[in-house]
A protein has these predicted regions:
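Short glycine-enriched, charge-decorated loop/helix-capping segments at active-site entrances
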Residues: 101-107, 145-149
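Short, loop-centered acidic/histidine patches that primarily coordinate divalent metals
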Residues: 130-133, 149
Length: 197
């Protein structure tokens, strides 16, 4: 079994924040593969279902970003899932908006969510870095990551998020390069922006 975790902040007002791209990504996976309705467990929303022939769980920690590791460590321990079978989706300032990089292990690059996960589980989990771009100045970072995507950004984002969900089985098989290739080959055509309901 795999655990797919999205990182974000829990309040509804943060729903379309750049910092919440991890939540946005796993929400589409939940929708596309008709995962069960969520239940609160391990200080997070937990959903279960099948992706292809693989049993999977999606977790959205509700602890705020800097305590994400508490939730994920509890879930991994309970379900006996090793860090190698944990996929974490999160925002990456140092990647241009819409770019994706996937890696197993590595540093946290100052990301508070990853720092918390590293402290609780070590570094050997999969990281799906979703680029949100950089505001250009360090003093603008805090307000930038907590601001909403613009309408135009939501358009391209919606297409990217659908592509991630469509091709997630490739990554779940352990083929990170194949997953990134699939995303780069897919044309980013959009029918509508993300819902703000």
């Amino acid at each position: 079994m795999l655990i797919l975790a999205g990182l974000g902040n829990p309040e509804p007002t943060h729903r379309l924040n750049r910092h919440n791209i991890g939540f946005i990504a796993v929400d589409e996976i939940i929708r596309r593969y008709a995962f069960s309705g969520g239940k609160m467990k391990f200080k997070g929303w937990l959903y279960d279902g099948m992706i292809g022939t693989e049993k999977a769980m999606v977790i959205k920690p509700q602890t705020y970003m800097n305590k994400s590791g508490e939730c994920l460590a509890a879930a991994c321990q309970f379900y006996k899932v090793s860090p190698e079978n944990l996929l974490v989706f999160y925002d990456e300032l140092d990647l241009p908006q819409g770019k994706i990089k996937v890696k197993q292990g590595g540093g946290n690059a100052g990301h508070n969510g990853l720092r918390s996960i590293d402290a609780h589980l070590g570094e050997n989990y999969w990281r799906i870095r979703i680029g949100i771009g950089h505001p250009g100045r360090k003093d603008l970072v805090h307000s930038y990551v907590l601001s909403n995507f613009t309408t135009n950004e939501q358009d391209s984002l919606a297409s990217l998020i659908k592509d991630i969900a469509e091709h997630i089985t490739v990554l779940m098989s352990g083929d990170a390069n194949g997953f990134m290739n699939k995303l780069s080959q897919t044309k980013k055509l959009l029918s509508k922006p993300l819902s703000t309901d």
